[in-house]
Amino acid sequence: MKAKEYLRTIQKLESETKECYGQAEYLKNAINNLSNQNAIETVEELIVDLMDEASDYAIHRVHLINELLNVDDPMQYTLLHYRYCLDYSWHKIAYKLKASVGFVKNLHGEALKSLDRYLEDCCNAEKE
C-alpha cells in the first residue's frame, strides 16, 4: 500500500465512523414514532450493530494513525496528522507550524516519501 492510499484509508474510516453514528442517531429518533414492540426491538438491534461497526472503524483508524508515528521526524507526523486526521487546509497547517505554505507542501512530499519507505519496509518484513 502506498502512502496516499494509506492516508485516504484513514480519512475514509473517519467518514464511515461518522456515517454509522449518524444512522444510529436517526434510528434513535425514529424509535419514538414506532408502536410495534417487535419493530422497536429490531431497530434497537440495528442501532447496536451500527455502534459496533462505528467502534470497529474508529479502532482501525486509531491503529493506522499510530503507525504514522514511524515517519522520519515529528514535524512530518504532525503535518500528516493535521492534513489527514484533522482535515486542515495547507494554510491552517502553515499557520500551526509557523511556516510558509511552500515549506509545508515540501515537507508533505518528504513525509509521503518517509511513509512510503516505512510501509515498504513493513510489507517486506511481512513477506519474510
Name each model-derived stretch.
Residues 80, 92-94:
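Hydrophobic positions on the alpha-helical face of helix-turn-helix-like DNA-binding modules
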Residues 56, 73-74, 89:
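Alpha-helical structural elements of signaling/regulatory helical domains
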